[in-house]
Amino acid sequence: MGGRPPPSVGSVVVADTTMFTDAKLREVLGARSLEEAARIMARILARASRMGLTVYITPSVRAEIERFMLGNGVHPTTIARLMAWVRVKPPTTHELRLPAAMFRRYVETVRARLDKGLRVAEDHVRRALRSRDEEGDIVRSLREKYREYTRKGMLDSVEDVDTLLLALELGAAIVTSDEGLRRAAEDLGLTVLTPVELLEYILALEEEVKSVEE
């Protein structure tokens, strides 16, 4: 693993769904399945909680985590044990303020990406008219390209926005491997950690506690 995350992480973090589903984290944990990874994470978060680190998620993120885990064979009891070590809180959406410049940039980005998406759709229509490719192949290609040009690297879900707003409200670091959420958080001056970096931070805290006790 790499070095310890910056000390500005503090005692509160807000996590998105990728904290619990990240493939790289699963690899670092040595988990062979999502079920095993969830069990290990529950134990790690329990230890983190005892050291004073609080992990928040929003209701929309919790629902997304549960859907994903249930759909991938994680037992409901395991999910409940994992969720026992996080706090669920919605952002106060009517009281928060965002910089006008950020909102303007976001609208400009959305418009530019929609234009690219339209060109991708037009290209695939022309390809369908002049080629003998299977319809399924063309549709698959269209979906992949359209998603790449219109969604990759930007806020593209309610869950992302909720996570960003809650972190802003709490003045907390964000834990995510999502590129779009990371960029938006950094625009607002928030600290961002990947799921693996959070694990490193927790392990570093444990080492500090041990050294103090000794």
Swiss-Prot record:
Q: In which organism is this protein found?
A: Aeropyrum pernix (strain ATCC 700893 / DSM 11879 / JCM 9820 / NBRC 100138 / K1)
- Top enzyme category: hydrolase
EC assignment: the record states 3.1.26.5
Q: Which GO terms describe its molecular function?
A: ribonuclease P activity
Q: Which reaction does it catalyse?
A: Endonucleolytic cleavage of RNA, removing 5'-extranucleotides from tRNA precursor
Protein role: RNA-free RNase P that catalyzes the removal of the 5'-leader sequence from pre-tRNA to produce the mature 5'-terminus.
Q: Which NCBIfam families match?
A: PRK04358.1-6, RNA_lig_partner
Q: What name does UniProt use for this protein?
A: RNA-free ribonuclease P
Q: Which Gene Ontology BP terms does the record give? A: tRNA 5'-leader removal
Does this entry carry the keyword Hydrolase?
yes
- Family indicated by similarity: Belongs to the HARP family.
User: Keyword Hydrolase: yes or no?
Assistant: yes
Q: Which SUPFAM superfamilies match?
A: PIN domain-like
Q: Name one Pfam family in it.
A: PIN_5
Keywords recorded for this protein, A-Z: Endonuclease, Hydrolase, Nuclease, tRNA processing
Q: Which InterPro entries match?
A: PIN-like_dom_sf, RNA_free_RNase_P
